Amino acid sequence: MDLHNKLSGCFIGKNIGGTLGMPYEGIETYNDLTWYRPVPDGAIPNDDLDLQLVWIEAFKTHGVALDSQRLSKYWMKYIDCHMDEYGIALRNMNKGVMPPLSGKHDNFFTESMGAAIRAEIWASLFPGKPLTAGYYAWQDSMVDHCGEGIYAEMFIAILESDLYASGNLRESLDFAIVFLPDDSRLKTAFNDIINLYESSISATEARDLIMKKYGSVNFTDTVMNLSFIVMALLYGENDFSKTILLAVNCGQDTDCTGATAGAIMGILLGKEAIPDQWKEKVGDDFVVGDGIGCTTPKSVSELIDAIEKIHDKMPDELPEITLPFRLPELTDFAERVPWVVNGRRIEFPGGIKIDSMLYPEVLGKNPLLKTIVSFNKTGTINLTISTIGIFVCNWDKNFIGSKGDQMQPIPAPHRVRGGRIWPVTVKAGQKYELEILMYSTWPIPEVYVIFSDLHTHRHIIPQYHI
């Protein structure tokens, strides 16, 4: 099979799987899809593809010298996407915290799916060169992830790059698993799934066992979702339709699992072998989201043309990761954000997270947290408070709301879970008191406090006056 057919299959498969899964993103239960539902009139915007289209523009400019520092500049100049780890990485970089710390510092979502979904561009730029694809996936993912979040993108890039050359899905899957360190949770999960598959239990049973052992309250958790992808690849038995439906029907981060499974199957089978019923509903065009601020390829054909032109000029000497590979140790730093807790001034080490277990003797049974903030803008912004705890919140000495459940927190302004979000109106330079009264629970919970743009969810960095 020619490389052009595989490259086209990769990104058409990515588009199909993302379009199939998008309407079910975040659904935690098992789905029962057999085809698109609803049936689309074309492709839809998806960050699974959007950021990769920016990366191809970055590679056109920087070539093999592209690294995390150069990618961070493209983030800050051209990407206005603030979901989960994207928003935290941009917040960090706007404060001068650059890679690799931008992916670790104050980041609840270090091991989410945001990097793993960007792997196709590196595999496709370096087909049959998995250690080079893995190198660029590492440079990419460290901007907004650490730990398993980095290994996840490297794993997918290595698998896909090797698959371009091998044409054997199981062979490339095994090769990519070997790359992972022995203490990686991803590696443990993948080996568990292979054992489940080889024991002949059903795909539905395998999905339930994955959830039991690796399930997360965060529907974008990368160990959980990559486990679904690997399960779908094994149980799909080289059938495009069966594989993407298995991935999406597992639930959780369905646009990402469907898109990645579709890309892998597209590489394996090529564009021509993808059933027409899937292709004709999304077509060749990309629909790029509003958060992308530069000119990008407008279709699969245009993207593949750009990739093939880069192939023609690729130098012989390319960077590679060395095996065995292990991420370097990374030490975070403390921001020292001031609060008054039960009458005592405390500087917490995070800009978002108040780690109350650092001071259990001060917080007592009913912690009262106060701070005073100001902003460099005028208008209405969002205040997000996320915690497993029960609390009452006052803003500028006025009650604005409370939380009466003990749901696990997901501190993201666009999808807050285990918390509340309120619009508050501010004037530039004016000071506002924020007061959070926590009710008695044990252990004393962490509290996440985020200010963000009302519409884009861009993190807004306050000034503190305690």
Q: Model regions: which residues?
A:
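Beta-strand-rich ligand-recognition modules
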Residues: 397-444
